[in-house]
Each structure stands twice: as structure tokens, then as C-alpha cells.
A protein has these predicted regions:
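Hydrophobic structural packing positions in well-ordered secondary structure
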Residues: 61, 139, 196, 277-280, ...
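Long, charge-rich, low-complexity alpha-helical segments
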Residues: 31-147, 523, 531
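Helix-biased "structured C-terminal domain" signature
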Residues: 287-504, 514-678
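Short, hydrophobic alpha-helical segments
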Residues: 52, 81, 269, 273-289, ...
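A short, well-structured beta->alpha microelement
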Residues: 140-176
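Long, low-complexity, charged/polar intrinsically disordered regions in eukaryotic proteins
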Residues: 1-33
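E1/E1-like adenylate-forming module used to activate ubiquitin-like modifiers
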Residues: 162-165, 175-274, 285, 301
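Structural motif
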Residues: 125-134, 151-154, 180-186, 206-209
Length: 678
């Protein structure tokens, strides 16, 4: 606010609380905290605040002060006005609605005008039960002059309305500025939501979910349906969000509406109604920025209140039609062959896309994080041991699971955890609208870039080795391709599922899977060779190698490059194989392979199975112990790797995992490289 706007009679906002700070002072308000620096600023503000009542002009406040102190007062008042902490004139709000006016004064320069707009708004309340009744009272007491309560399901004979009337247009007042829906059933809320959206009327939902009440606004950019679908991604027991063929809004509401809320007592009902009423006030008056894409959760037993942000969900009535879809869906060309111009545009955009800034990944990824409504619930160290490696975990939604990342620093570990989380989520985020009639999506042959249909069950498989999220498209595809090569190399050489536990018995026991040396000839790489490869790989690999030496881990590295001739090394501890890594060069496998060995040892020594690596087929005991040390395999180009796969009947296809456009916008390079066996 310009200085001249408050020079008349400055008044400090009623929600401002002054507290000292080591470097000056803080003013804590409903809108956040404002900081003022300076050795004496807290003393100045403390002395000045009692006089900023809106009754005295700046000239009157400074008339008896020396010029230097008068100038300081004017500068402080100007700073307060510029930050919206001081209003121009008038006493603090008072009267029967001083609470509402006081709240609005925190967000509006003219709280009275905002409150008048609120009073003039028509509000319809849909629902029955104790919470609906209490909320109706709260809204009337807050100053709303036009609140109508609709009790669906009571029947016309009792003066009510029949189920389904809202969707028929008989219930919804087209003049309403807001509909408030109170229910225990998300399916009922969805029916109300869609009816209101069709009529262009915003709706505030209060939906009970177990021992919680979730409240949020839907309309315009905001979508309660999106928020609820995000919530359901964390709660496998959440009620399905699908309305019946003939929505019976009243039946669900009248039957048990808010009985659960009432069971927690009258005080809980009162708090829940007050919360919903406050959000109505904030929405109608635009008192708070950022209510879009948020839901507020009231935990009914404890009355703890938290606000959660969500990204728009791709499966909702508000989701836009995808720009790129597989032809062969309804209205397309049968056969599931992708539209060539659209496919070419899509692939070109991925290839030409800017790499994700690693330093900015923390800020960009924050939009995906929320404990209840996020794509990722948390990224943290969870009390894991942080030596020798830093280990971070990310919780992933839809369905809930845990992924981890490790590295030499906490930031590096978190980056890898976020990438793993995005890959895992993207591999389960399937939009039915983007499948063709046969349930397929579009992939791209790595051999020639030609689009091919891929079964959705194959493309969206979070356990597949080729599921990767990277910082750029080329890197993600390459990582997915090489992970498939490692799986093929180890898997194709696997003999029986397990070794017999008892000599002379042909029944396989539950022991580890062993590789058949007839198909794979492990060649031992001595420490000197490993050191040379690590030096070629870079500082990270060398650091891992030094850690293994300090910990006296009996590292074993074998060249297991098979018929594909893609450099593949097996990394282990003694006779135990920990993992297989393929690369374009043998040196390219060292960083991931040595990190896997360290992670295995850290998990084992600290008894922390969360980040333990999955079992892999085992090399035979003392593999490659004879014949001397081997030279590392020859390097290959990516084109040679693809050609080798095709020559052996393995056709690699890259499928972009981009069905959630919000996640794709933040981290666009998630892919599953699948192998089509011809």
C-alpha cells in the first residue's frame, strides 16, 4: 500500500502480534510472519503500536517529536502500510459480527465492504443431521441473510424433496452463490459436486471419512473430486468415489449423515460446524489466497485441524481431454496404432525437453508432497543409519508403498528417493481415457522410433526393471534399457528355481536361485582392475570403493557379460551376489554396483530391512576363481545394445509414463522400457 494511503489515521491490524527476534522483531499475523531487522526496531514498534488506533493522524503522532524521531515514525508507518499491517483510519471492527469483521480485516483493506458482499450471498445447505443443523445456525449467526437448508430424502409428503431432485435441477437454486454439502458418503458428495459444476455454482463439501471430517471448496480451478481421489490413493479402505447410476443424494445423507460426527459429542459438532462456517466466509469473501487445491482435515477425536494441498487428479470430471491418445479408442481407428503426427510431436518434445535442474528439484518436488493428499507423502531419513551411506525414503501413493535412495550426501539420497518415488507412482497411474479399445498405450521402438501399441498391464508395471525416472529423456531411456539388459543377462542364465536342499533329492528347496554356468561364464575381476574402472567412473565410485576397504568388506566383482555382449558386472560380498549392473562401458556399472554392495552391508549390519536389496540369482560358489583375472568387457554404443537385443528376439520399446499431467509437468522423464519378445 502506498504511504499516502495510510498517512491519514493509521490503524494496526487486530491480528498483529509483535514478538522480539535476535535480529529485530517479528509480526505474526493470520497471513504469516513479517520480519523487521534492526537493533532498536522492536523497541520502536512496541512504543508505537498502542498509538496506531486509527484515531490520530501521522502528523498528530509526530507533532511533538524531534525531526529525526518523527522521520523514523513516518518510515515505520510507511513500512507497516506497505506490508499490509496497517489500515487507514477507523476503530477496530466491533459489534455483533466483530469476529467475522476482524478476520476480514486481516485480508481486506475494507472489511466492511467485504462483509456486506458476504451478507448478500445466497447459500444453499444440502444435508441433514446434527452437523448440518449446527452449520445452518452458524451460517445464520455469522451474518448470512440468505441461507436455505435443503433436506433431501424426506419426501414431498413431509414437505421435503425426493432423492435425485438436485440432479434434475429442481433443488439447485440458480441464483445461489454457494452450495454447502454435508454428508458421510463421498459418492453423494460427487453427485452434488457434478450437479453444481454443471450449473456453474461453487460448492463447499464437508465429508466425514472415518474419524475425520474433510472440508474443501470445489468450483472453477478447484476440484473436491481431485482432492478426494488423492486421499483415496493413501487409504485403500476409502469409500469408492463413484455415484450410482441414479444418484440417491438424500438416501445416503438422511440415513446416517453425520451420525459419526455426533457420536463424538456436541462440542465436536460445534467445532466442525465452526470450521466449515469459517471456510464459507473465507471463500465467499476471497479472504485467503490459495484455498484452491486444498482440503482441511478435522480429526474428530482430538479436534486437531490440518490443511493439505493436492495436485489436480487426472481421473476426474474436470480433467482435460489428453492431447495425445492412442487411436483405436472410441471414435478412433481400430487396431490401437498411434496417430503419427501426434506421436512424432510427443517424442520430439520429450527428446528436446530441458533437463530437470537437480538443485531445483527440492522446490519443484514440494508440489507433490503432502502426508495425506500428495503424490509423495514424505521424503525423509526416517531414523535410518547414515553411515557409510546417506539413506532417504519416500512414501508413494496409489497404492501406498515405500522407496529409498542412497548416496554420499543427504541431498543426493533425497534426489534418488524422489526419482524412485516418481517412477513408482507413474508406473501405477493409468488413465483409462488414454487406452485404446484393447487396453493398450503407445510406446516407441528404440530401434527406429516407430510407435507400437503396448498392453497397459505390461507398460504400467512398477516391478518391471525398465521403470525409471531421470533428469532427461535420453538418460531415463538409457537407464531403463540397461536395467532390462541386466535382468535379461542374469535371468536367461538362471538354472532351476533353486538348489535341492537335501543331497539326492530332486525337489527344489527355498534357497537362492543360482545361475547356470553353461549359459554364463563368470570371470573374476581383481581389485586392481576394479580400482582402474572406479577411477574411470569418477569420484563417487572411488569413494564407495574406499568405504568398502575401510569396512573390510570382501568385495567380489565378476564380468558376466552374456550373449548380448552388453557389459554386465555382478557385484557381491564373498560368495553372495548382491546385484547385476549393465552399462555401455564396464566402468559405467561401478557407481551403482558398489553403492548396492554398501547398501546391502549397511542394511544388514544395522538391521534395517527397509532399504535391503531384493534377492537376485546367485553366481555359483567360487565363480571365476580359476583361470586368473579377466579383462573388462569391450564397450558398446546404445545403438549396438538395441541391435543386439533385436538380433536375439528382444525388441525394446520405450513407454512414457505420463498419464498424470501434473506430475509429468514437474518431472517429465518417467519411462518404462519394456521388452517385446518376437
Amino acid at each position: 500500500m502506498p504511504e499516502h494511503a495510510v498517512t491519514a489515521r493509521p490503524r494496526l491490524r487486530g491480528d498483529v502480534h509483535l514478538v522480539p527476534a535476535p535480529d529485530g522483531a517479528r509480526m505474526v499475523t493470520n497471513r504469516g510472519t513479517e520480519s523487521f531487522t534492526g537493533g532498536s526496531i522492536h523497541q520502536w514498534l512496541s512504543r508505537l503500536a498502542p498509538y496506531l488506533t486509527g484515531t490520530a493522524t501521522v502528523g498528530e503522532l509526530t507533532g511533538a517529536l524531534p525531526p529525526d524521531k518523527a522521520g523514523q515514525v513516518r518510515r515505520i508507518v510507511a513500512a507497516l502500510a506497505e506490508r499490509g499491517l496497517a489500515r487507514d483510519g477507523g476503530p477496530a471492527p466491533d459489534g455483533p459480527h466483530r469476529g467475522e469483521l476482524g478476520l476480514l480485516d486481516s485480508f481486506h483493506h475494507d472489511a466492511t465492504a467485504a462483509f456486506r458482499r458476504y451478507q448478500a450471498t445466497r447459500v444453499q445447505l444440502v444435508g441433514v443431521g446434527p452437523l448440518a443443523a449446527e452449520l445452518h445456525r452458524v451460517l445464520r449467526d455469522s451474518g448470512l441473510d440468505r441461507v436455505t437448508a435443503v433436506r433431501p430424502g424426506e419426501g414431498r409428503a413431509r414437505g421435503g424433496l425426493l432423492d435425485g431432485d438436485l440432479l434434475d435441477g429442481n433443488l439447485l437454486d440458480p441464483r445461489a452463490g454457494l452450495v454447502v454439502s454435508v454428508t458421510d458418503h463421498p459418492g453423494n458428495a460427487l453427485a452434488v459436486d457434478r450437479a453444481c459444476r454443471a450449473a456453474g455454482v461453487p460448492v463447499l463439501h464437508a465429508v466425514r471419512h472415518g474419524d475425520e471430517l474433510w472440508v474443501g471448496v470445489s468450483g472453477g480451478a478447484a476440484s473436491w473430486e481431485c482432492g478426494w481421489r488423492r486421499l483415496a490413493g493413501w487409504d485403500v479402505g476409502a469409500a469408492p468415489l463413484e455415484p450410482a447410476d441414479e444418484p440417491r443424494i438424500g438416501a445416503g445423507v438422511a440415513g446416517v449423515s453425520n451420525a459419526g460426527v455426533a457420536a463424538f459429542g456436541d462440542s465436536t459438532v460445534a467445532v466442525a460446524a465452526s470450521l466449515a462456517g469459517m471456510l464459507v466466509l473465507r471463500h465467499v469473501t476471497s479472504a485467503v489466497d490459495g484455498l484452491d487445491h486444498t482440503l482441511t482435515c478435522l480429526h474428530l477425536p482430538s479436534l486437531r485441524c490440518t490443511t493439505h494441498r493436492y495436485l489436480p487428479h487426472f481421473v476426474s470430471s474436470t480433467a482435460p481431454t489428453p492431447r495425445v491418445a492412442v487411436r483405436g479408442a472410441a471414435g478412433g481407428v481400430a487396431g490401437g496404432v498411434a496417430d503419427p503426427p501426434a506421436v512424432a510431436e510427443r517424442l520430439a518434445a520429450l527428446r528436446a525437453g530441458e533437463p530437470v535442474d537437480r538443485e531445483g528439484l527440492d522446490a519443484a518436488g514440494a508440489a507433490m508432497l503432502d502426508a495425506r493428499l500428495g503424490v509423495l507423502g514424505e521424503v525423509s531419513e526416517r531414523g535410518y543409519a547414515q553411515l557409510p551411506l546417506n539413506v532417504s525414503a519416500a512414501t508413494v501413493s496409489a497404492p501406498p508403498r515405500l522407496v529409498t535412495g542412497a548416496g554420499l550426501t543427504v541431498r543426493e539420497a533425497r534426489w534418488r528417493a524422489v526419482l524412485a518415488g516418481v517412477a513408482a507412482y507413474s508406473a501405477t497411474a493409468v488413465d483409462p481415457a488414454r487406452l485404446d479399445a484393447a487396453g493398450r498405450v503407445c510406446g516407441y521402438r528404440l530401434a527406429d522410433g516407430r510407435p507400437v501399441p503396448v498392453d497397459a498391464g505390461v507398460a504400467f508395471d512398477p516391478a518391471a526393471p525398465g521403470v525409471v525416472a531421470g533428469y532427461d529423456w535420453a538418460g531415463a531411456v538409457s537407464a531403463g534399457l540397461l536395467a532390462c539388459c541386466a535382468r535379461l543377462t542374469a535371468g536367461s542364465a538362471a538354472a532351476q528355481p533353486a538348489r535341492p536342499q537335501t543331497p539326492g533329492t530332486q525337489t527344489p528347496g527355498p534357497g537362492p536361485q543360482f545361475l547356470d554356468p553353461r549359459f554364463l561364464d563368470p570371470r573374476y575381476l581383481d581389485l586392481r582392475t576394479v580400482e582402474v574402472l572406479a577411477a574411470d567412473a569418477g569420484e563417487e565410485a572411488l569413494a564407495y570403493l574406499r568405504m568398502l576397504e575401510i569396512l573390510s568388506v570382501p568385495l567380489a566383482v565378476h564380468d558376466v557379460t552374456g550373449v548380448l555382449q552388453v557389459p554386465t558386472l555382478a557385484f557381491g560380498v564373498g560368495d553372495r551376489t548382491i546385484g547385476y549392473v549393465s552399462g555401455l562401458r564396464a566402468a559405467d556399472t561401478l557407481t551403482a554396483g558398489l553403492r548396492a554392495v554398501l547398501l546391502h552391508e549397511q542394511s544388514r549390519r544395522h538391521g534395517q530391512p527397509d532399504y535391503a536389496l531384493p534377492e537376485v540369482p546367485q553366481l555359483p560358489p567360487h565363480a571365476g576363481a580359476t583361470g586368473g583375472a579377466a579383462e573388462p568387457p569391450a564397450p558398446r554404443t546404445e545403438a549396438q545394445v538395441v541391435a543386439a537385443l533385436v538380433a536375439h528376439g528382444h525388441d525394446p520399446v520405450a513407454v512414457p509414463l505420463d498419464h498424470d499431467p501434473q506430475v509429468h509437468r514437474i518431472l517429465p522423464y518417467a519411462v518404462n522400457v519394456v521388452i517385446s519378445h518376437s
